Amino acid sequence: MRLRALATAAAIALTALPAYAHFGVLMPGSELVNRPKTPLELTLAFCHPVEQNGMNRAKPEAFDVWQNGEKTSLLNTLKETQVLKHEAWKSTFTVTRPGTYTFAFTPKPYWEPAEDKFIVHYTKVVVGAMGDEEGWEKPLGLPAEIVPLTRPFANWAGAEFRGRVLFDGKPAPEGTPIEIEFWNGSKAKLPNDYLITLQAVTGANGEFAFTAPFAGWWGFAALGDAPKMAKDGKMKDVERGAVLWTHFTKVPSQLAK
C-alpha cells in the first residue's frame, strides 16, 4: 500500500506551467469507428493547441498505422492542407475490419529560433474499431513514446488516464516533464495563463496520471533530450518529445446525477 501511495503521489503531482508549449498534433475525425469500410480522416499539424496558434509542419519523415502487430506506411497518402493558417497534412484511411488502429508520425526536426533548439515530437493516436480493443497497450518502438496504461479511447471526462513514457524503449527517468493541453477549437479564454499548459512529472518506471476536467481532445507531451544537431555550423540542442492524443467523452446529465 505504501509503494502504491508513493507512486500515485509522484504520478499525479500536477503544477501549472506559464509557458506556450509546442505540440505535434495527430487528430482523427473520430476516436471510434463503428462500421466497416468507414473512411477515417486524419490531420497532422504542429501548434499551440490551447492558444490555437499554428506553425508550419513539413511533410513527416514517416507516417504509419499499426494494427494487429502489422505496420503499414501511410506516407504516400498524405496531402498538403492548412491548420490554423499554417502548412499541415491530411490523410484518409479506410477501416475495413474490427481492431485497434494506432497511427503515428515521425516529423522532420523543427527549428525554433525563440528557444535556440530543434524540436522533434513523435506523435500518435489510437482509434478503436467495431468493438475490438486488443493491443492498445503495446509499444510501437518509437524513439520517444507514451504507452497508454489506460485504454486511450472511449473514456469519460473525469476518469483518470495513465501512461508510461519510454525513451529508446526504456522508462523515462523519474521527474521527466509532461506538458498537457486540450484542443481549444472554440478559442475559449482561460482565467489565467497558468492554465494554458498544465504539467505533470513521471514517477517510478516513467509512469504518470492525469484526470481530464472536461470533455474533448487532450494531448500529452513528454519531453527529453536527443543528441545535438548542426545549425549554421553550430551544434544545437534537440528537444525530443513523445506525444499522445486521446479523447474524453462528456458524461450525460442523466448519468451525472
What are these regions (language model features)?
Residues 64-113:
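Mid-chain, structured segments of secreted extracytoplasmic proteins
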Residues 90-93, 205-211:
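Short, surface-exposed beta-strand/beta-hairpin micro-motifs centered on an aromatic residue
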Residues 51, 108-115, 226-232:
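Short acidic/polar inter-strand loop motif in beta-rich domains
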Residues 53-63, 170-178:
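Short flexible loop/turn segments that cap and initiate beta-strands
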Residues 45-53, 167-169:
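Short amphipathic, basic-aromatic surface patches that mediate peripheral association
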Residues 187-205:
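Short, acidic Ser/Thr/Gly-rich low-complexity loop/linker segments typical of extracellular
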Residues 17-21:
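Sec/Tat signal peptide C-region and signal peptidase I cleavage site
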Residues 22-41, 116-176, 182-186, 234-257:
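Beta-strand-rich domain onsets/edges
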